[in-house]
């Protein structure tokens, strides 16, 4: 009977949430459950491509596609709304478009930028966070070149860019920048030698997930393209002039008219308001990706702190993990609907590739180090596969990297 259908509610159409939906809609009939997907935008965007749109090497439109283009409307009700409250005990979710009841809840609300309380960071630095921030940043970079070219009183700081963070996002953004800068210089008649790109990293090593050989390749490649690295140099503040850094216990002002923060992400702030034991927007889940005390609430993606059995630290927040969690959660939701026990999540690490612009990269694929053009090719394969897994061959052909 239709009135006996369980209500399955999925919050967020990022990698984890949309993967849950696209897999679940293939596994159940419309009579088995009333499935609702809530997302604040009517589009999904490829978050792992944000560094490209932020640098301007691709358009922001290349990042996104309509959620409804991959949703089976006969089985899934899509609602464009912003979630404002999760009441786990009353089994209700409040949004700006009304209140939704649930029997099974999947929380996959995605990430936000984490500034670690650094003074002025939110006010003065660009973030690599979503489609809107990407549009603003790429436009700002070009505006500064245009301003420099048209001004009688040249301000060299218009051609200075400082990036905070030499982790994955920071390095990939730097790679795209080194592709974009020659285009901008050519367009606006600017001498490329006048452009100054600086990367500041507090940790003693950049890209800590990779071997020294791969890190050295990335550093050499980017330095040859004009990037200056300041490693082991914490940023203590951001202001209207740029970043304030600490060097040998002394503060120094680094000046630029474009400063970018790419050194941290956290789960949605709604997590702290809705659940206990949340740190930086992430909650520790059980092995089946539900949370303690609530066998009908799954938390996946950037809001999930999943610690594999026998280990001490949670897995990092990556699209690969989020996608696998989404696939697994779809199966577990199906199990619950059929009165079957849930299964434990087992992550399969297929590797990681960090792009250095369109033609180079470093990475580890199935335990083997790769670099150069081979890594760049693998990155395109990974990006295209991610689109294929959500939208099939048609979407992969339209939005993929080949």
Swiss-Prot record:
One Pfam match: Pyr_redox_2
- Name its co-factor(s): FAD
Keyword Oxidoreductase assigned: yes
The UniProt entry, under InterPro entries, shows: FAD/NAD-bd_sf, FAD/NAD-binding_dom, NADH-Q_oxidoreductase
Record has Oxidoreductase as a keyword:
yes
Describe how the cofactor binds.
Binds 1 FAD per subunit.
Q: Where is the active site?
A: 172
Give binding positions for FAD: 12-16, 39-40, 83, 302, 319-320, 379
An annotated Gene Ontology molecular function: NAD(P)H dehydrogenase (quinone) activity
Report keywords, A-Z.
Answer: Cell membrane, FAD, Flavoprotein, Membrane, NAD, Oxidoreductase
Provide the family line.
Answer: Belongs to the NADH dehydrogenase family.
Name recorded for this polypeptide = Type II NADH:quinone oxidoreductase
Give the species: Staphylococcus saprophyticus subsp. saprophyticus (strain ATCC 15305 / DSM 20229 / NCIMB 8711 / NCTC 7292 / S-41)
